């Protein structure tokens, strides 16, 4: 960055903002880069400002019981704030004084007042000087207030971030990530520009008092008629505002419904294409869009009337002020024009400035109070450690994730006794409440010596992660003692990668030791991966490690933990995403050898790890099931496998929770409308019955992270339906929560509410920060694996990959959740995250405007209609002028003359008409014509938005994956959220305002030019200068705005990155380092924003200077060339003053239109995306064995079997090469093999070898070359839809969209209920669906959050059964499944797909039992294609990965003679499907 010219600028340069000229010149000539931006002054640095505010806030906390953040802000910024406020007031006062001089100038033209004529020139000079003074006062004042607002935002940004790093885990579990981002975007952005309006709260009353005093002098009591009208108008506008809010509230819910489906569609676009659901999704979204647009139109009409009221009110204000006085006393011409000028100022003050100021204070104080509440939340308490301690000891430790259960229970009991329910069954309310306080860990005792390895095992939800959290101090024990040295290193279950190089991620701020670093790299099997990168370990990783595979991320996280020299290493399931061979090597070389002298606690479920551990701790439901050595375990607990793996009583355990959850659900549906709660009760945070099905449940929209939620919490109650939460006066639909994209931080979205098309759980869910930290960003390999060159993160948002226990054991916060969300409005939709795909020109091209206008032919006619009406208005004014100009003047003797006023001219009847006709024609107040001009325009522009949304949706759904792979999913989603919101809301009204203002200015100039032709000569250069200055400024300002957007992205990215890795940060003590990084991101953004504000003020000041010059010219031309016509001078000067304010407003509107049209450019860019090859490249009548084959995919149950293709499922793959993008590197090369009909093939290979990619290539989701045939039919011979319908798919990332069970299973509605129930029976879903209200019509939301991951897999299985596909593709179906669901899937595969070809991609050896052939993929090519027996020869790498116990499972008969009977480990053998009885999930 360059040094800022501001540092050496003179006072004059600072006053006129001349120091910005170098950047404006450079931006006009070339494209600006980040290096061109100036450094910020030290007074604006985040370090200085945060320290200043933090010091005052600490002082406030120390001195008062009820600390107020506003007091701390006052002590920091008050005096500067008031200084600029006084400047602003003085500038506004000049506007009130100008009409006085105008009146004197007009009076000087009175033929009977000759002595005044001589001083007219001096009065003109005085009037021009007032304009100059106003310019010199207002612009520095406004800039100063913007600057203070920026500093306040920076200081509070930093304070919030620092507080976030200190929050306790309990508090983090009650705050959504969306709310925190909302803090830093919507709430704090109010300070940036809103502060300039704040002073009008006191300026406007003073100004109104001054103006009314001056008008009283002219018109006496009549003055209050105009003021009364303005007050009525302001109240009318307030009423319209309330009506508009009502429509916006209703519309917000509809927008959310559309966005939830749209985002699910984008996040799972590969699944949509694999299932051939493009048409179904498009129809679904368009139906929601229709309903939304009806409300959009209503809101737009109300906003139109609100905006029009200001324009059309000018005439009435003057008319009502002047008419009573004129009727009673008669009126002089001077008073009319002076009143007009006063009323222009009065109208702006009362109807615009004062309401805006009140709204600013309301918003700002609300934001400050929310931030204040946040800053007082409970902080993470650092435990006291003894550094001399060598062992790790826990004595009688019990812990809860929640506090104060006794008090909560009493509140609930009291509240429930006051509540009258319709069914009278109060006992249901407490059915599980007594179990709410079940501890997550109970009576834990163990001791491990230095250098020992403790393996912690247990089923999902047993409390394994919670145990590690307690050792780290994240979970405070309610009883017992914990003792260790405090020097901890931690590896999370879900690998966390910060933006930076691989080396920086591993070293993580610890001093660099080359020898140690190399040994860690080698032990974690990273040498081979690093060698593939050109920059080796200096390659820069994106946020979340987007360019790495899940296994690579896991190994880097482990390497970071191992590199740190600590006494105690906590490893939470670090091998979850590694293939068997890699896992085995790392466990041996890293955990057992490299760390041999260190104390290690390893969470694992692998038998091999338990055998090598010094001690084993098995947890079950939060209690110790076993503690000891492996040999003791075999002797004392022969049934331990069931507790370890979750087999024993799993189904009963789940069923118990399932029954209670469904009982509560049904009960809440019956109570939902019967138990209203008073406002008083909600404010007291009383218990209430809501429709919230686990408020803290994951929201796939809010938390776009490839995640699996395995946070170990055991609660006896499935979901606390009766939790305490803060109520809000706002409707649910108005809640907004913004969240960045999981791994790149580029999307910001409104809070998604639920679809209300059937029986559903009306919920407002939020993704807690604690959830965010316990979720994975590397859930195995996505079907579309990332390459380093690619910029798209394929899986934007996951579905809830949750185990059944986790779903049913999720707790609801007992403490009030922090509510800092906002309603959806234009500001909320501002992009928090920059789209780096955006390559839109700095200024919107004329081609974009032309294309936008021609989208809908009606728009052209409407614009012509607007022009015709405008010409009619101007023509009417000119005709009146001509007519009155030719009317002979009235005889002076007929007029009444007041001797009391030395220079008063009494207007006759004719001349009074003259004045009012001119004013009517010029001020654009032909109400009927104005009304008919604007409303059709707004209506048509919304229709254009509807058409563009439809075209963009169709284009995205039909785009090939090779194109979509080059885009960020968050960027696509921003087009449907932010840009469509701009097209719907902002653009129509902004275009209307601009056209309205432009026509007013042109009309006024036309009338002035007719009255005084010399003025037209002065107008031409002013217009030319305005156009040139606007073009000059826009070129730079749009680039600065773009750079500001880019600078904003790292702030939010860093926040989310910090939250994801917060436990790691704390364990490593890296909070100060991350605070420094955050301040650097803030300073970068500040540099861009400050320069944008400065250049904007430069432009505004230059525009005003041009207008001042124009007004000076008009004034002196009028004074020097006008003879005796005081009316003419009055009209010219009044209009010139009006043009001054209106033209500047029009200039700003034109800049806004240009900025908003960039959204249109982005939408057109998506509309122009290429489409998939829909038609076959060969004949659509393929031949098989020389005979014509009738190609038919089963789409309903009534087709004849003879017409069906495929019939057998034979596949032949020849020279298949696959790429993600057109010019990308091949992911698979020259793959050739064949599969016999009905054969089962397993895909084997290391993480990232291309297994999932091969399945995608089968579906033609990638850029492919070569040929694939199914039953002799080539993929070139059929359409894409026909080809993909030949496959049934169970993807790695399960896709459940928001809609009914029926829609999710059969989106095209091809099957009857009987057929759907039959399939549900086959896959074990019937008992689940039947217990929900509405059964098949029950609406699933949030990616099916009420279903476990197993249920979702079964849903995918049911879809495949319904599709009657002959080839089934399974991508790691057993990942994260509980054993029971896994057995059901195995059984269904045997029964429903007995005669189908099955291709299975799996890491687990036991999952491969049914496969006859195995395809080994290595280095993008087929290494081997054979049976497992041949793969397990001595030369095979895979033999090393298969343990003897696995071989027993794979070949039980072959090995039975060699294996002695070992009854004590009989439980280790996999349960056969016969042992798993008819399991009801």
Curated annotation (Swiss-Prot):
GO aspect biological process, one term: intracellular pH elevation
Positions of the ABC transporter domain: 423-646, 1211-1444
Glycan attachment positions: 894, 900
A Pfam family recorded for this sequence: CFTR_R
Membrane topology designation: Multi-pass membrane protein
Binding locations of ATP 2: 1220, 1245-1252
Sites where the protein binds ATP 1: 401, 434, 458-465, 493
Spans within the Extracellular topological domain: 99-122, 217-222, 320-339, 880-918, 1012-1013, 1117-1130
Biased composition (Acidic residues): 1471-1481
Entry keyword set: ATP-binding, Cell membrane, Chloride, Chloride channel, Endoplasmic reticulum, Endosome, Glycoprotein, Ion channel, Ion transport, Isomerase, Isopeptide bond, Lipoprotein, Membrane, Nucleotide-binding, Nucleus, Palmitate, Phosphoprotein, Repeat, Transmembrane, Transmembrane helix, Transport, Ubl conjugation
Gene Ontology terms for molecular function: ABC-type transporter activity; ATP binding; ATP hydrolysis activity; bicarbonate transmembrane transporter activity; chloride channel activity; chloride channel inhibitor activity; chloride transmembrane transporter activity; intracellularly ATP-gated chloride channel activity
Glycyl lysine isopeptide (Lys-Gly) (interchain with G-Cter in ubiquitin) crosslink, residue number(s): 688
UniProt EC number: 5.6.1.6
UniProt-listed SMART domains: AAA (SM00382)
Record's catalysed reaction(s): ATP + H2O + closed Cl(-) channel = ADP + phosphate + open Cl(-) channel; chloride(in) = chloride(out); hydrogencarbonate(in) = hydrogencarbonate(out); ATP + H2O = ADP + phosphate + H(+)
InterPro entries (UniProt xref): AAA+_ATPase, ABC1_TM_dom, ABC1_TM_sf, ABC_transporter-like_ATP-bd, ABC_transporter-like_CS, ABC_transporter_C-like, CFTR/ABCC7, CFTR1_ATP-bd_dom1
Segments for region (Disordered): 1462-1481
Residue ranges of every copy of the ABC transmembrane type-1 domain listed in the record: 81-365, 859-1155
GO cellular component assignments: apical plasma membrane; chloride channel complex; cytosol; early endosome; early endosome membrane; endoplasmic reticulum membrane; membrane; nucleus
Modification type Phosphothreonine: residues: 717
PANTHER family hit by this protein: ATP-BINDING CASSETTE SUB-FAMILY C (PTHR24223), CYSTIC FIBROSIS TRANSMEMBRANE CONDUCTANCE REGULATOR (PTHR24223:SF19)
Function recorded in the entry: Epithelial ion channel that plays an important role in the regulation of epithelial ion and water transport and fluid homeostasis. Mediates the transport of chloride ions across the cell membrane. Possesses an intrinsic ATPase activity and utilizes ATP to gate its channel; the passive flow of anions through the channel is gated by cycles of ATP binding and hydrolysis by the ATP-binding domains. The ion channel is also permeable to HCO(3)(-); selectivity depends on the extracellular chloride concentration.
NCBIfam families per the UniProt record, alphabetical: CFTR_protein (TIGR01271)
Name of the protein in question: Cystic fibrosis transmembrane conductance regulator
